[in-house]
Amino acid sequence: MHHTPPEAKFTTLTLFGISSGNIRWGLAQMGTSVPKLKQVPGLLFFKLLGSGRGKGFSIKPNFRRYGLMCTWQSKADADVFLRHSPLMQEYQQHTDEVWTLKMLPYQQHGLWDGQAPFTPVLAQPHTSGPIAVLTRASINWRALPGFWRFVPKTSQALDNAEGLIC
């Protein structure tokens, strides 16, 4: 019997640059967008993402930069949401920058909220083109000093990384 492997989960990462007068609105979206996102047809998994200042490795938050990572039932579902949803239209009204990356995962490690949102992954290994690396970690309080000790070197390495978008 011939078995066709399931298609990789279509994934989007949208970054928002909140405009100056809408900082409080942007912060509020971390809570108020959740019920709206739970109602989006074809949306399988989502995470609202905050960011740190500078290259992102800062204890100080960047209240102007947020992200929305989603996995979808289909590319068509993602396109409808990105182009026509009231929530995305609301974001457009409160931002001066919106950028969406559309991706197919080819590797995943670990779980987000007990789920593996990027499986299944591509059956064929990645051979060419851009690669995005999404990382997520919870750091134990006792491990924080060790983590922060490596931040300067990591940030410096990012300064020299070809193709880095910050």
Predicted regions and their residues:
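Short S/T/G/P-rich N-terminal loop/turn motif that feeds into the first structured element of a domain
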Residues: M1-F57, N62-R65, K75-F81, D96-I165
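Conserved RNP beta-strands of RNA recognition motif
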Residues: L68-C70
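A common structural junction motif
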Residues: P86-T95
